[in-house]
Amino acid sequence: MSKAILLLRHGEEPAIQPNLDLSSDGQKRAERLAKFIPKEFGKPGSIFVASPSSSSARCYLTMRPLATALKATVDASFKGEDYAPLAFKLLGDPALRHELVVVCWTHNDLPSLAAYLNVRRKDFPTRWPDDDYDSLFVLSYKNGTRPVVKAMTQPF
């Protein structure tokens, strides 16, 4: 089996800022993702989120229903700007070599993370739109090559 990494943004945020939480739409998205991801891609072996900060816990809150449903843990040990260490872990850790890995991150940092994951610039947005909560990217790796990237829209 080849390695696959799902990259997605956290769920919707409340209109009133600052607010660390998800909006009601974001909470609904998190619940839907908990069903959609295993059904569409299989059970993930690992879930990574940007560590909660003083400005947001939305990545963790988006993945919590998935982790709960799968009785899995969420790795929140990387800060949002820790692209290189996270990419090194995702691509170099033998324990993750053949797993499906889900990564939920902040939209401003996803393009940089994708670059560290060897994604070609033409295959990923250089700037993630502020209003895009629906996109999901599947990075498929075989034998250490650059990933084949499939862009998807979440069906909800």
Model-derived segments and spans:
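Active-site-proximal alpha-helix that buttresses catalytic centers in soluble enzyme cores
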Residues: M1-H98, D109-F156
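Short beta-strand segments
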Residues: C104-T106
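Conserved beta-strand position immediately N-terminal to the Walker
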Residues: V101
